[in-house]
Amino acid sequence: QAYSAMQNPVLKSSSTSGPVFAPRGDWLKAGELRRNPDLARTYRAIADQGRDAFYEGDIAREIARYSEENDGLITYEDLKRHEVEWQEPVAISYRGRTVYEAPPNSSGHVLLQELGIFEHFDPQEYGYMSSESIHLMVEAKKLAFADREAYLADPRYVDIPIEGMLDPAYLSERAQLIDVDNAAENVVEGNPWEYMSRRPDSRKKHREAGRLHKVGSDTTHFCVVDRWGNSVGELQSIQTAFGSCVIAGSTGILLNNRMTYWHLDPDHIDYLNPGQKVRHTMNPLMVFSAPVEQGGKLELVCGTPGADTQVQTNMQIVTGIFDYGLNVSEAIDGPRWTHVQAGMGSAYPHKDIESLQIEDRVGEDVMSGLQKLGHPIQSTGAWGGAGSEGAIQVDIKNHTFFAASDPRREGDALVW
């Protein structure tokens, strides 16, 4: 489906990608087989020789060769230096449960901020997917995205006040900015440094009190839970569909185009720097009955592709289950909204136009109510919302699992 929709001319014209995706100079038709024997050889080499085959062996050399011959920036030394980082997750308490997210440079904290702000409102006062509840969640999202735009980058290069951003008092302060009767037009970041136990590290770039201080949608998600409660949530992405649309020489590997998330303004917190990791939107999510160190049990693991929409879709799943009593399938199938915040989109050129995109299954009264609150509404039809959520819910009391996959995109859910 995505393949036929893209029809990217680079994918077709490239001397390495064209023979795979458009053999004979034309796109494959339904029922025809796509063959990529180079990629099969790459997989076999990794299976036989391990990670060094990719990062230090012939595969790395071929990627570097192709990059150099085509004016790319990837070198053999870049690949050789790569190391996986094991990091502690970030977490907040939400209505008596503990929600864990990926730490910076992931946008996982954005979802936690959204939930922490929304927690200051009583969901039972507003119906599920009512204009009032959607309004409150959208306004919480705006505040969290404003903080992301101001503070999130690679923590090795930028000092991020992450503890302050997740501090309950700070989230309460942010929640008080929400007008229940009107959509905010100009949302700015707060100052979470006031809620930190330390001052910013002067050796790193950081933003404080509105000032920047300087030193001198090709994503896949899956989640798994075994009978003992061990769980994995994984997201992998080469950015937009088919990434750069270019295969690296004879490796069969499509190169990504994640660098479109960089900002080229030196005064932006996520400004392009050598060796720095670009911030990203992938945020695998787990919800436990209590903190893990206190014996908390897994209740939900979920995730979705969708760039800036990920933390918004995940918010709707978590609130649907734990605020409105939906099961995991009902929460995923429910009407979905996505807010686009002017000037705060992750992808270059970062010039998005403000809109609230929503599936019209919410009903005309909800759409009308949101417009009256000041939201610029765009209908996405009945099932045209963003994301492709996959989730597993665990019933701790009865020791049963429930899995669901998003009907909006290709996906599957299995329990046995």
Language-model features and meaning:
Residues W228, Q276, N314-M315, D323-G384:
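Extended C-terminal subregions enriched in glycine
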Residues Q1-G50, F54-E56, A60-S106, L166, ...:
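Noncatalytic scaffold domains of N-terminal-nucleophile
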Residues L73-T75, V225-L300, A307, V311, ...:
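Active-site rim segments in enzyme catalytic domains, especially the processed small/beta chain
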